[in-house]
């Protein structure tokens, strides 16, 4: 499988990458980038996780799974390396061995019978795990009190947390089960595990989790891994999508031999991690691509929805404008019809035009707003409202108007008002027998 092409980093990501390298001292730029990507480029989270890793503390950003991760211990491809105790040498050695053999057999037989009988009387208290983190921390404290502080970085968390972090970070996890009652445990811890070469090797290549089988958490792990003797080491990694035991080391192993055996296990199984890392990167890129496609689809959908919304708004606005135009036209037509009916009613109510030789005749010439002239006779005794009604009844007369004399210019009070409740007669208004009046349009005022 070819490695997918790495995406180019933005300027902000490049700055975070360099800052993370300065803070952590990691020389590999690829490792820095991978760590930041695992934390979504959150530099504070990545630095804190790196510090936790150096101290063996589980990641505070990786929550513990609700169910413990299952470990495949039945893989037939598990590499097993057992160190047998050295055979007796010489006549004296064999003699001592043969003399002590019956006592050893008797001791271990009686011990097994005693433990078996005790289980019927009182259940093994180690079977109840109440504080797994406390069990691990307590073992680490006792280990440092007995063997000093020069040792591999212990993972300060539960076995399940260690499995989860190893799975998430695609790293090897070395599990050490400490048998306090075994005769080789003290020698292994003092002369193998705490040797600087071994310590540096483990710290740089894998996570390291350890606990005593006398602790409930260690006993629980012991029941799962089923060791045969002590010291016991198990190498666990993500293989075929499962956390799998790929190596078992049992017995008192020497420092260089331990490094060689672990190196062999790592190199034999490194391809699985590389393959899983490539698949994970491919899945991440596929997920990113799918997310980008989803975002593009949502953006397109929102654009279409916005376009449809604007279209509906435009249609709704057009519909309202058409309705308003229709309503306005209907009101104008009704107003026009009412005006025509009012003009017709005023025309029917007008008194008849007096004969030309009537002594009270007043001949008035009206100059209309459109420039035309209208002539009619009225009586001096008639009210100015008659003049107004006559002009109102004409088709060319605007809806609102006023009547003005020429000289001196004054507006004739043809309609009732608060000052003049009853309009005066033509004579009272001072009109002469032959009069020119102007009709002014007030429609726009």
UniProtKB/Swiss-Prot annotation:
GO cellular component, one term: lipid droplet
GO annotation (BP), single: stress granule disassembly
Annotated spans, Disordered: 303-354
Protein keywords: Coiled coil, Cytoplasm, Endoplasmic reticulum, Lipid droplet
Sections of the chain in a coiled coil: 275-353
Residues of the UBA domain: 12-53
Top-rank taxon, per record: Eukaryota
Ranges of biased composition (kind: Basic and acidic residues): 303-348
Domain UBX residue range list: 357-439
UniProt KW Calcium keyword: no
UniProt-listed Pfam families: FAF1, UBA_8, UBX
Molecular functions (GO terms): protein-macromolecule adaptor activity
Classification via PROSITE patterns: UBX
Compartments where located: Cytoplasm; Lipid droplet; Endoplasmic reticulum
PANTHER family: FAS-ASSOCIATED FACTOR 2, FAS-ASSOCIATED PROTEIN
Function: Plays an important role in endoplasmic reticulum-associated degradation (ERAD) that mediates ubiquitin-dependent degradation of misfolded endoplasmic reticulum proteins. Involved in inhibition of lipid droplet degradation. Involved in stress granule disassembly.
Protein name: FAS-associated factor 2
Biological source species: Xenopus tropicalis
Gene: faf2
């Amino acid at each position: 499988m070819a490695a997918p092409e790495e995406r180019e980093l933005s300027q902000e990501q490049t700055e975070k990458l360099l800052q993370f390298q300065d803070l952590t001292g990691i020389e590999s730029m690829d490792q820095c980038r991978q760590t930041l990507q695992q934390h979504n480029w959150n530099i504070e989270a990545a630095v804190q996780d790196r510090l936790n890793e150096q101290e063996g503390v589980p990641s505070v950003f990786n929550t513990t799974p609700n169910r413990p991760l299952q470990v495949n211990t039945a893989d037939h491809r598990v590499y097993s390396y057992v160190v047998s105790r050295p055979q007796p040498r010489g006549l004296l050695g064999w003699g001592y061995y043969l003399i002590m053999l019956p006592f050893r057999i008797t001791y271990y037989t009686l011990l097994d019978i005693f433990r078996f009988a005790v289980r019927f009387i009182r259940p093994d208290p180690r079977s109840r795990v109440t504080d797994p983190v406390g069990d691990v921390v307590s073992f680490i404290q006792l280990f440092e009190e007995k063997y000093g502080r020069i040792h591999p970085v212990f993972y300060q968390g539960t076995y399940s947390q260690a499995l989860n972090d190893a799975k998430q970070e695609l790293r090897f996890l070395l599990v050490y089960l400490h048998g306090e009652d075994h005769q080789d445990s003290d020698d292994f811890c003092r002369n193998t595990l705490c040797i600087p070469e071994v310590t540096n090797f483990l710290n740089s290549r894998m996570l390291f989790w350890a606990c005593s089988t006398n602790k409930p958490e260690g006993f629980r792990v012991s029941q799962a891994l089923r060791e045969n003797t002590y010291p016991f080491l198990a190498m666990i990694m993500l293989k075929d999508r499962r956390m799998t035991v790929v190596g078992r080391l049992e017995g008192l192993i020497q420092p260089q031999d331990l490094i060689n055996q672990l190196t062999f296990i790592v190199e034999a199984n490194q391809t699985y991690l590389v393959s899983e890392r490539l698949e994970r990167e491919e899945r991440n890129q596929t997920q990113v691509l799918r997310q980008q496609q989803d975002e593009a689809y949502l953006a397109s959908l929102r654009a279409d929805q916005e376009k449809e919304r604007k279209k509906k708004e435009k249609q709704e606005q057009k519909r309202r404008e058409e309705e308003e135009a229709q309503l306005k036209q209907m009101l104008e037509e009704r107003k026009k019809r009412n005006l025509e009916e009012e003009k017709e009613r005023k025309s029917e109510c007008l008194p008849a035009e007096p004969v030309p030789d009537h002594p009270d005749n007043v001949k008035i010439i009206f100059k209309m707003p459109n420039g035309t002239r209208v002539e009619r006779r009225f009586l001096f005794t008639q009210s100015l409202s008659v003049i107004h009604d006559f002009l109102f009844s004409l088709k060319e007369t605007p809806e609102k108007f006023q009547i003005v004399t020429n000289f001196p210019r004054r507006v004739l009070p043809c309609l009732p008002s608060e000052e003049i409740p009853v309009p005066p007669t033509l004579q009272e208004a001072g009109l002469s027998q032959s009069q020119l009046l102007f009709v002014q349009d007030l429609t726009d005022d």
